[in-house]
Every structure is written in C-alpha cells, then in structure tokens.
A protein has these predicted regions:
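Transmembrane beta-barrel strands of outer-membrane/channel proteins
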Residues: 8-14, 46-52, 129-133, 213-219, ...
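Outer-membrane beta-barrel "beta-signal"
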Residues: 409, 574-595
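Predominantly transmembrane beta-strands of Gram-negative outer membrane beta-barrel pores used
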Residues: 1-23, 30-38, 45-47, 116-119, ...
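Acidic/polar loop-and-plug regions of large Gram-negative outer-membrane beta-barrel proteins
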Residues: 25, 36-38, 43-116, 139-190, ...
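Residues on the lipid-exposed face of transmembrane beta-strands in outer-membrane beta-barrel proteins
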Residues: 1, 33-37, 115-119, 197-203, ...
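Gram-negative outer-membrane beta-barrel transporters
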Residues: 293, 416-434, 440-524, 544-546, ...
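Structural signature of Gram-negative outer-membrane beta-barrels, strongest in the C-terminal barrel
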Residues: 192, 204, 208-220, 225-229, ...
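Repeated loop/turn-to-beta-strand initiation elements of outer-membrane beta-barrel proteins
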Residues: 3-6, 41-46, 125-127, 208-211, ...
Length: 595
C-alpha cells in the first residue's frame, strides 16, 4: 500500500572458495527482511535476519620468509585444509566425548529480530527507539601450523630417538624432509545471544540548533569452549595426508594422525570454557549548532556495566576416547575442562567519552574542520586467564581501554576535483590475548599521520583515491618493555588505494590498486615484509534493461602480499608461518533487477 513497504534480500552460496581445500568449504546463506509502516509523523519498521553460513578460515600457513612458496605448497592458492582431514574428536565443554567438523570453518548461526520507531512530536521534538534481540551460536574450526620443520626432529620430539613417520591413510613410510605439527583451533560458540536497545529524544530549534538525550542498554553473552587437538601432517597443498608417529621399538604414539588430545607443544594452555554475561548502560547527550559559517557539534556519554560468570582452564585425565576398551598413548593424557575448579568473573566498569568538533566554511568550495575526542571500550573475555583476580575482580585500569584522538583537516572542491586532507594524532590503550602465541598485551600506542582522499570526474571517467601516512610507535608496555619505541607489528608507513573507472552507455570498466609499504611482522621489529600493490580489474555490461553481467579479476598479476606472520625473526630453516593475500581469482556475476 502507499503506507506499507517491505524489503527481502539474502544469498545462498556453495563452493570451495579461493584456495584448494578439497571439499565444499563455503556453504550456506542468509535472509534479511524488513517491513515498514509509514504514519503522518513517522514510521515503524520491523526487522528479521537469519544467517547460517560456513566459510573456511585461513590461518597463517608455511612459506619462506621472503614470500616464496615451499615446493608442493603454493602460498597463494593452497591451504593445510584437506579432504583427508575433516573430523576431530575431543572432550567438549562438559567433558563429554564429542566430535568437531573442520569443514564447518567459520559457521555463525544467527536469528535476529528487531524494530525501530521514529516519530516527530509537537514543539519540534523527535523520539526514536531501536531494539534488537539476537540468538547467536556456531562454530569456528580451522588448522594452524604450530611448527613447520624437519620431519625426523618432529617425530623424535614425540616418539623419541629413532621415531619415524608414516602416512595415516595408507601406512606407507613418510620420507619427505619437512612436516607440520598442526593444532586444531576448534571453538564451539554455545551462546553469544545479545539484547540491545537505543532510545533517544531530540529537540530542534529554529536556528539550526538541536540537542539529543539518549540511553543505550545492552546485554551480551559470551559462552564458548576452546577444544584444541594436535596432529602431524605432510607439508603439501593438495589434500595433504595426516602422519602417524611410531617409536623405534614399534610403539604407536598416534592414531589417525592425532598424537595428543590437547596442545602439549603449547603446554596445554588453551583448552578453555567461558560462561559470562556483560551488561552495559550508557546515557548520552549530543548538541549541534551553527554560528554563521561555523558548525559545531559536541557529545558526551557515560558507559557503565558489569561482568558476571565463570571460566575454567585445562585439566588432563585418562579417557578411552575411541571406546575400544584400550588406552592408547594419546588417551593417557586427554585435555579437558577443569569444571571443578572454575574461576569467577565478577567486576564492574565505567568510563566517560566525549567528542567536540567544528567545521568552518571559508567559502562555498573550501572548509576546515577540527575534532578532539576521547572514547573507550570495556574489555571482556580477553581479560580472562590473565587479568582477572582470584575473586573475579579486575583492576580499573585493566577493565577499560581508552582512546584519545585529535584531528584537523581541510576540504576543497573544484569543478571536477575534490580533495580532503586530515591530520591526526591518537593515543590508544590495548589489553588483549593472542591464542596462537599465548601472549598477553598490556600497552599503549601513539600514532600521528595524514589521510588524503580525492575524487576526480572528467567526461565518462571517474577517478578515486586515498592514502594514509602513519607514524606509529609502542609508547608503553607493562609486560614487554623491550618493545617500547618500536613500530607496532603489521603497521605500514603508507597504505593507499586508487581506482579508475570508465562509464559507457551499457556498463563500466575499470582497474583498482590497493597497496602498502613495508611493515614489520612482529613488535620486535626484526623480520620485515616487503610492500606490495594488488591490482584488480572489472568490467560490466547491461545485456538488457534488467540483466547485467560482470567480470571481476582480483590480484590480476598474482602478486605476493604478506599481511602477517607468527615469527618475528627469520628462523634457521627460513620457513615462517604467515598469511598472504590470495593469488589471482576470477568471478563472473549475473544480476537481474526486478522492476
């Protein structure tokens, strides 16, 4: 009807993905819908979303420190994922024997409903409310090489002097020089439900002035179980096989490639169970006005909340995992959850935020602006297993990370050209935990830089570009003071993107460039990645008024671009575990638009 409208959209997908996993690793879909009812003075909109999607999670994988691929494993197109390794058996968060499916990859399951209502009231008041309730669960299951090295040394680290490896599928002796120690990053997301409401009331005045009063409230559950296992695998990209370990006297130290239930190579650090709830309440106020050619806005917010729940770490026991009536060597020490000795989570937090900005319009084509702001975030599950005291409390300085930022910029428009330039300075706190290195972070960063954005239109051509220069350093580090003054890992001095597009009567064609200069792999500032530029091309054509076909080629020149690595220095064998951009990928899209 004239006052009721709706929108329904979504996607369904199925495929292997950009790297060769050996199975259908991207599978699932989403549907989103909304229904809007218009009134004379506002509207009410209802939302619904259902998501159940699986996509492979690519973690750092083996390559040489200069980005070259290792024989048999292409760093740009291969992955340790394999059709010969799809299941893992472990104890779940309740210490019951259960199985995980590596093919689940990143598998969020979300059902979300919500509404928003916006109405204009008498005397220039406006009332708004937005509400959302989400039921969230799922899985994360991927493979991370914990070690890439000599096959014989890895075998002997498990089975002793003279231990050998064999193919877990065929039983044939394994004679390659290199092998991988694989850990399954296996997480069951039991309950990530959330409830969010944002209410605001705005008063507008005749002189371009308005003031808003609001109240935000949310509840977020974080209940999940980390269920790691350890395997050996050949270093190969196309359906790599699992490897078994046999001692010199014939004793079997593994079964179907699994040599440990847990991660003894990491000290069995990471078998974990979380069951926590985080509540947040935040009143806020915002003000804006215009004084001649100067626009001013200011806002303030006070966040407070509480964290309640418990968490438990690892404990080992003897368990007949395959129920065959015998206890194998891996079954002698099975990592489970220490439920009997769970630790409490019981702390509160609060912090204030503000932002003040001004824009001065010098003339219709030139303006300057400035902003000073302070914000923060309450730390949640990353504090557990490190910063939470025995009674569940947390130090005030650990509960919240704050950010202070200053910006100043200029905006200039010409007939066909626009240029925006912003200088910034930021101070950022970080409390964090990295599972793959079992490292806690308690530090502060300082960064200053300049960001430039520009657009240029001439005839049928469209050019766009942006670049950011950043000078960042680790200003403080409570746990590792040796890195103070160093550049934060993965932070390049310059990042940029450029795009050129030609628009013709029935479509468009163009090319884009995304690039970065050199960056350090880790905070010790030793191993450094080369900068790179990724070139992408695209072309589209309207087959009819409603039907369009498009061709996209990403990484047109098959460039190697390393984005992160576990190692901070080049190891003796020159092999690192790193993540690189995908090699060349091509897609063809057919789109039909309904009238």
């Amino acid at each position: 009807t004239d006052s009721v409208r709706f929108h329904v959209g979504g996607f369904v997908r199925q495929g292997e993905g950009p790297r060769e996993t050996g199975y259908t690793s991207n599978k699932g879909g989403q549907i989103k819908a909304n229904l809007t009812k218009d009134f004379d003075n506002g509207y009410v909109r209802l939302y619904y979303k259902h998501l159940d999607d699986k996509s492979v999670g690519y973690l750092p994988m083996p390559m040489y420190s200069n980005g070259d691929s290792i024989a048999g494993f292409d760093a740009q197109s291969d992955t340790p994922h394999s059709a010969l390794f799809t299941k893992t058996v472990r104890l779940n968060g309740e210490n019951q024997i259960s199985s995980g499916d590596i093919r689940d990859g990143m598998n969020p399951k979300v059902d979300s409903v919500g509404f928003e209502a916006v109405f204009d009231l008498d005397n220039d008041w406006r009332i708004e409310n937005r509400f959302r309730k989400s039921s969230i669960s799922g899985n994360f299951n991927s493979l991370i090489p914990a070690e890439v090295g000599s096959a014989s040394s890895i075998a002997q680290s498990i089975g002793g002097v003279g231990a050998t490896l064999s193919n877990a599928n065929t039983g044939a002796a394994f004679n390659d020089n290199l092998a991988m120690r694989i850990h399954t990053f296996d997480v069951t997301m039991n309950d990530f439900d959330s409830l969010v409401n944002d209410f605001k009331l705005t008063k507008s005045f005749d002189d371009d002035t308005s003031i808003t009063f609001g109240y935000y409230a949310s509840t977020q559950n974080i209940a999940m179980s980390w269920l790691w296992n350890s395997y050996l695998m050949e270093l190969k990209g196309d359906n790599a096989a699992l490897l078994n370990v046999t001692a010199a006297d014939g004793t079997e130290f593994s079964e179907n490639g699994l040599y440990a239930y847990g991660t003894p190579y990491w000290g069995n650090c990471c078998q974990r169970d979380y069951d926590t709830e985080y509540d947040t309440r935040a009143p806020y106020v915002a003000f804006s006005t215009k004084l001649g050619d100067v626009s001013i806005d200011a806002s303030a917010r006070y966040d407070s909340g509480e964290a309640r729940g418990n968490y438990a770490g690892a404990v080992t026991s003897t368990v007949d995992m395959n129920r065959d009536g015998e206890i194998s060597i891996p079954e002698q020490n099975v990592a489970g959850i220490d439920i009997a000795n769970a630790s409490p989570v019981n702390y509160d937090w609060n912090y204030s935020s503000y932002s003040i900005g001004a824009n001065y319009q010098i003339d219709p084509s030139l303006a300057t602006f400035a902003r000073i702001s302070k914000g923060g975030r309450a730390n949640a599950d990353r504090l557990l297993f490190g910063k939470v005291r025995a009674d569940g409390s947390v130090a005030k300085e650990d509960a919240v990370d704050e950010v202070n930022q200053f910006e100043f910029g200029v905006k200039k428009r010409f007939d066909s050209l626009s240029v925006f330039a912003t200088a910034f300075f930021a101070e950022t706190e970080e409390q964090n935990f990295e599972a793959t290195s079992q490292t806690f972070f308690d530090r502060e960063y300082e960064a200053k830089g300049i960001e430039i954005e520009s657009t240029y239109f001439i005839d049928a051509w469209d050019f766009r570009g942006n670049l950011t220069w950043t000078d960042a350093e680790i200003a403080k580090d409570a746990l590792n003071p040796d890195v103070v003054g160093n550049t934060p890992r993965r932070q390049a001095d310059l990042i940029y993107s450029l795009m050129a597009r030609y628009n013709y009567e029935k479509g468009a064609a163009g090319v884009s460039f995304i690039g970065t200069t050199d960056a350090y792999a880790q905070d010790n500032n030793d191993l450094q990645f080369d900068g790179y530029t990724q070139v992408n091309g695209f072309v589209s054509y309207d087959l009819s008024e409603n039907l369009n076909i498009a061709l996209n080629v990403n990484n047109l020149f098959d460039t190697v671009g390393i984005t992160e690595a576990e190692e901070g220095s080049v190891p003796e064998n020159n092999i690192i575990r790193a993540r690189t951009i995908n090699g060349r990928t091509t897609s063809v899209t057919l789109k039909y638009a309904f009238n």
